[in-house]
Amino acid sequence: MKCYFLILFVCLISCTNRNNENSPEKIAIQKVIVIQPLGNFESEQANKVLSEIRIVNPNVVLRGVIPFPGNSYYKPRNRYRADSIIKSLKNNIGKDSVIVGLSHSDISTTKNGIKDWGVMGLGYRPGKACVVSDFRLSVKNKNEQFYKLVLHELGHTAGLPHCKVKSCLMRDAEGGNPLNEEIGFCENCNKFLKSKGWQLK
């Protein structure tokens, strides 16, 4: 009889543990998002980004504008190295935060064997920092495109790769600007970000 109750008790504990694995408590709490304007980036536009991000994460703060890191300027092309910016930014936040740099100036990185490739944004997967620039965005719908770009790079820092769904915000730009064709995160990317604490529909 004692053996029977012992087996029953072990089974109950096992079932409870399996249920807890999928409980809401297991869902990650989203990190604090720090918005960092760079160079001559206007506070008005930075505040617009702040308001938009609060929709998906209320834990967001806006810092005052700072100069670009001195070692990030690439004189031959008169632009800033995104990888150098990220390296500098990630050293100025806590372990439970992720920082996004905002730029009007052109930014670049090394890609496909090209030493200095101009980009709209850069974020490592996963990572603590990313940077975006509106330099290459269309004049029409620039604010909307810029916000989509911010979400794209923050998606990378959360761990998302590029997505093959053409309407997904995680689509690879492939040297172009498909932002007007992107309407939101696809089902799979949405599910992943929700597991990271993002407040998406």
Where are these regions (language model features)?
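Sec-dependent signal peptide recognition
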Residues: 1-8
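C-terminal motif of bacterial Sec signal peptides marking the signal peptidase cleavage site
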Residues: 12-14
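Bacterial signal peptide processing site
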Residues: 16-18
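Short boundary motifs at domain starts and secondary-structure transition points
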Residues: 20-28
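Fold-level signature of zinc-dependent metallopeptidase catalytic domains
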Residues: 29-41
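Metalloprotease/metallohydrolase-associated module, dominated by Zn2+-dependent proteases
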Residues: 39, 117-145, 161-201
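Metzincin-family zinc-dependent endopeptidase catalytic domain
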Residues: 43-149, 157, 161
